[in-house]
Amino acid sequence: MGCGISSFKRDSSSNSNGTSNNGKDVLKGKTNKGSFNNNNSGNTNTNNNAATTNNNNNNNNNNNDTSTINNLNTSQSKINNSSGSSSNNNKTGVGEQPQQTPQNINSSQERKNSVNQPNNNNNNNNNNNNNSNNNSSNNIANNTGSSNPTVSHTKSLSQSMNNSNNNSNNNNNTPASIKPNSSPVLTTQVETQQNPLTNSGNGLNKSQSQPHPTSQPSSSSLTKQQQPQQQQPQQCINSPQPTQENNNNNNNNNNNNNNNNNTSKLTDSGKKPDFNNSNNSNSNINVNSVNPSQNNNNNNNNNNNNNNNNNNNVVHNNNNNNNNNNNNNNNNNNNNNNNNNNNNNNSNNISASITNNVGSSNSNTLNNLNNSTLASNDINNPFPGCTAILKNGVWYTESELLEENYVWTPKYWTPDRIGKWVDDIEFSENLTNPSNSNSPNQQAQQQAQQQAQQQQQQAQQTQQQQTQQQTTQQQTQQAQQQQQVQQQSSSPFANNTTNLSTTPNPSTSVTNKNDNPIESI
């Protein structure tokens, strides 16, 4: 780029050239020469890139951080390239400067043009501010439909911060005073001075901060721009002082740090878009256009707002946790109620068993009732027609209790005959000697013993009878045998036969030793 001052005219018809092909023609240096609106087209191209990155933000949060760093690098490259000239032209948005013949700096007309040059720069800065404001609002509108509004909004804020950096550099690059006799400063020297910005600790990439080879002017353009400097070096105006450039570097570093804080906010909160940050970004742009030294204060305010948003998110998360805990407590209460219901059921069962026990006790032992008297017409009265009185577990009539020397005749409840009171059959009523009267238990034992004795006697009798029958049978058998022997001895064949044995031989039925065919009797 040349550093000579020349008068320029505004060309409103060159806006279409800057926006074609997303700034590709601008990067190649094919725009109209001498138009200041190329700066606006460069900003438009940057905003188009921001819109593209916003669309990518909907898909990947990690790409948001990288895209933010890329935008910062492009903004740094703009700073490095735009500081070499007195105009607002940069390599990304403006092509070659027009070649004009050098004029006499001592002429009044040229001095007027050179004095009016900063005013033109201020107007261009205002235009850039308007573009940046519109772009930031467009980014907010586009980001409302995204799945993660906060991520996209932070991206638009970083884009607006990049625009504000460009504006502040434009203000600082305006010459404060005209020095006709100053030495020329080449663009290559300015680039070497501002290259350390790329190596600052802002996470910027050195390769990304350097301008693209296509955006650099050709060798022919460099020679064309350097010819006026070689012929008339005294007519060139000096570039901004190094102290001003260092101040710009400091401001840019602060802005970059704030952008990094915004990217850290992406990881902390992702709930709702914060429209207060968009307003703060617009206010930062306006302030940067007026006084670049106020960047630090405004950026600190942005950081405070971001911190407040983070705190709100944390509180909101705590509220969610409290709600969950309350739900758990409610569930526990329900469980406790269920346990109480179970306990009630158990108590009901216990009471039912108690009532059953009471019923059984009433059915089995009515003598243990606490009622001391029963009316004469009571169903449970053992003495119908008389008042019954309970004493020591035994029911008595009133007359029995009133008589002094009366032997009590208790009435016993018989379970085999339910509902009736009967006297004990075996109970002896002896008025004079009550000790002679036996208890029914003793009588029962005596009866059992007597019955056992009788059974034994009967058994003995039966045994005796059996033995007698056996003896009689034996006697009859012996008598029959004697009769048979007598009959045999009186037969006519007695001389020819031998004595017969009383027991026959099982092998042969013949008992005669002489083998006579005589069958045994």
From Swiss-Prot:
It comes from the Eukaryota. The keyword Transcription regulation does not apply. Residues 97-108, 149-161, 174-206 have a biased composition (Polar residues). Residues 13-23, 37-90, 114-148, 162-173, 207-262, 276-356, 433-451, 467-488, 495-514 have a biased composition (Low complexity). Residues 1-356, 429-451, 467-521 are annotated as: Disordered. Keywords: Lipoprotein, Myristate. A lipid is attached at residue 2 (N-myristoyl glycine). This is Putative uncharacterized protein DDB_G0285119. It comes from Dictyostelium discoideum (Social amoeba). The lineage of its organism: Eukaryota, Amoebozoa, Evosea, Eumycetozoa, Dictyostelia.
